[in-house]
């Protein structure tokens, strides 16, 4: 069994360099919620140095709230903004002798696209227009995954080690209790269960089916690095190969 382990980078976290030694894919902020041209270049160089797959992490234009504010934008606006961000990172990767492999939306853009077919379509269309060989990463079972499949893109269904789930397989909103899994043992058991059995227990006690092709670990938590090391070791103990 194989699993991809991904982390968001270029968002101002001091742990980026250490995380790159543990993950197989990096989602690099493209300036709309965090980062700038210099951090994008630095992140690409670090990813290449560590043999980590490079991906774009486009967002709503919301630096003030780290891309976590809900927005109502026209699909064509989202298409243009997504194309702009992923095109910039693709150019930087190419200039450094690398290749951008995937796209994973950030924050509220990711969450809204999981449920909004028009928004999901705009993102998938932009990814396809930029490069139809790119992998589109989205929440397992979401509208974004369906939109990617509609455009013939390779999709990668994502689960989260440190997020609570609702009975329908969606994430608990960050504004609600249970959104974050702060107990390390719980997070480890939840992640292994999703990867090995394709199920996750919701905060209300029901079991939801999920497809786990990539696991997101966040680098901004208090014990993020220690947990990432534990999770990687647990995968290796079970002969689960970590690869993009």
Swiss-Prot record:
GO MF annotations, alphabetized: 5-oxoprolinase (ATP-hydrolyzing) activity; ATP binding
GO biological process: one example: carbohydrate metabolic process
InterPro entries per the UniProt record, alphabetical: Glyco_hydro/deAcase_b/a-brl, LamB/YcsF/PxpA-like
Matching Pfam families: LamB_YcsF
E.C. numbers: 3.5.2.9
Keyword terms: ATP-binding, Hydrolase, Nucleotide-binding
Class of enzymatic activity (EC top level): hydrolase
Segments passing through the bilayer: none
Subunit structure of this chain's protein: Forms a complex composed of PxpA, PxpB and PxpC.
Protein family per UniProt: Belongs to the LamB/PxpA family.
PANTHER family in UniProt: 5-OXOPROLINASE SUBUNIT A, UNCHARACTERIZED PROTEIN YBGL-RELATED
UniProt name for this protein: 5-oxoprolinase subunit A
Species: Citrobacter koseri (strain ATCC BAA-895 / CDC 4225-83 / SGSC4696)
Lineage of origin: Bacteria, Pseudomonadati, Pseudomonadota, Gammaproteobacteria, Enterobacterales
Gene that this sequence comes from: pxpA
């Amino acid at each position: 069994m194989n699993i991809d382990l991904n982390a968001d980078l270029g968002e101002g976290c001091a742990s980026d360099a250490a995380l790159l030694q543990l993950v197989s894919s990096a989602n690099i902020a493209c300036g709309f919620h965090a980062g700038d041209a210099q951090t994008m270049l630095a992140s690409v160089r670090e990813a290449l140095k560590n043999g980590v797959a490079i991906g774009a992490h486009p967002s709503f234009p919301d630096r003030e709230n780290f891309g976590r504010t809900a927005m109502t934008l026209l699909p064509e606006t989202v298409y243009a903004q997504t194309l702009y961000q992923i095109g910039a990172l693709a150019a930087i990767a190419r200039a450094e002798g690398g290749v951008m492999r995937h796209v994973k939306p950030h924050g509220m853009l990711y969450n809204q696209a999981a449920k909004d077919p028009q928004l999901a379509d705009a993102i998938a269309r932009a990814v396809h227009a930029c490069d139809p060989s790119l992998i589109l990463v989205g929440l397992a079972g979401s509208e974004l995954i369906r939109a990617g499949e509609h455009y013939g893109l390779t999709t990668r269904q994502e689960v989260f080690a440190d997020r609570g789930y609702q009975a329908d397989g969606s994430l608990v909103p960050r504004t609600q209790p249970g959104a974050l899994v702060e107990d390390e043992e719980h997070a480890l058991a939840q992640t292994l269960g999703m990867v090995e059995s394709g199920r996750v227990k919701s905060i209300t006690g029901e079991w939801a089916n999920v497809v786990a092709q990539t696991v997101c670990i966040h680098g901004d938590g208090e014990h993020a690095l220690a947990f990432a090391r534990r999770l990687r070791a647990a995968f290796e103990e079970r002969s689960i190969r970590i690869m993009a």
